């Protein structure tokens, strides 16, 4: 029993179980919003576990491609330490992917399509685009936003979740560029290609453009009469904070400001999520 529990603990470490649970909760939030909190327990469980398994697949694939780097930087991780063999990890990733895709079929065809696209992006990001950030940043934005979209397609009212997905994609894509601006020195040493490395401060204008697009889209659930006034009040506060943060960065485009703005943007994004939840429960 002790050996089994130790092995289980190692596999949970490999999949980064906390990250998987966080992603799954995002999927559930998407489902709650699209179903107006009229939930089906079976669908909720399916959404949770599909997101969990596909996310776990991505984390295992990431460690498979990073095994040589992790031998130096993270030698205690399951693969470089030898606690899990490379072939075992490859088989395990295949099992996780199959479980995720098969379970998504029990939701609907849209869920399957999103699961397949996400699995492909997770593979491509781990293999190639982690160090080529002009595309890698988009993938991170898409994958984060798609968690809500995946849960959303399980419900009846998908439009607000589509808007949440787009706002998440754009704002997180922009935030990733801000983070790259902060990390320029380290990225140069590691041979990473990013927009700030190629274009310097000009890249922050593109990041601002992405965030402003998210701001423009954000009132749509109110304009389309999907959500009420409390949503509009919360989202308006978020929009003002978004614009303030990016204006501050454009005024003082340095590493210290980028670090502060990156953290601030993350806080605002959590308030945006709260606004969508408040809108869905008709407060």
UniProtKB/Swiss-Prot annotation:
Keyword DNA damage on entry: no
Names of required cofactors: Mg(2+)
Catalytic activity: sn-3-O-(geranylgeranyl)glycerol 1-phosphate + (2E,6E,10E)-geranylgeranyl diphosphate = 2,3-bis-O-(geranylgeranyl)-sn-glycerol 1-phosphate + diphosphate
Compartment list: Cell membrane
Documented EC number(s): 2.5.1.42
Domain of life: Archaea
CC per GO annotation: plasma membrane
Any Pfam family hit: UbiA
Coiled coil: none
Keywords noted in UniProt: Cell membrane, Lipid biosynthesis, Lipid metabolism, Magnesium, Membrane, Phospholipid biosynthesis, Phospholipid metabolism, Transferase, Transmembrane, Transmembrane helix
Pathway(s) the chain acts in: Membrane lipid metabolism; glycerophospholipid metabolism
TM helices/strands, residue ranges: 21-41, 45-65, 97-117, 135-155, 158-178, 204-224, 226-246, 261-281
GO molecular function, one term: geranylgeranylglycerol-phosphate geranylgeranyltransferase activity
Bilayer topology: Multi-pass membrane protein
GO biological process, one term: glycerophospholipid biosynthetic process
InterPro entries in the cross-refs: DGGGP_synth (IPR023547), Prenyltransferase_related (IPR050475), UbiA_prenyltransferase (IPR000537), UbiA_sf (IPR044878)
Main location per the UniProt record: membrane
Family affiliation: Belongs to the UbiA prenyltransferase family. DGGGP synthase subfamily.
PANTHER family registered for this protein in UniProt: CHLOROPHYLL SYNTHASE (PTHR42723), CHLOROPHYLL SYNTHASE, CHLOROPLASTIC (PTHR42723:SF1)
Task performed by this protein: Prenyltransferase that catalyzes the transfer of the geranylgeranyl moiety of geranylgeranyl diphosphate (GGPP) to the C2 hydroxyl of (S)-3-O-geranylgeranylglyceryl phosphate (GGGP). This reaction is the second ether-bond-formation step in the biosynthesis of archaeal membrane lipids.
The protein's name: Digeranylgeranylglyceryl phosphate synthase
Source organism of this protein record: Methanocaldococcus jannaschii (strain ATCC 43067 / DSM 2661 / JAL-1 / JCM 10045 / NBRC 100440) (Methanococcus jannaschii)
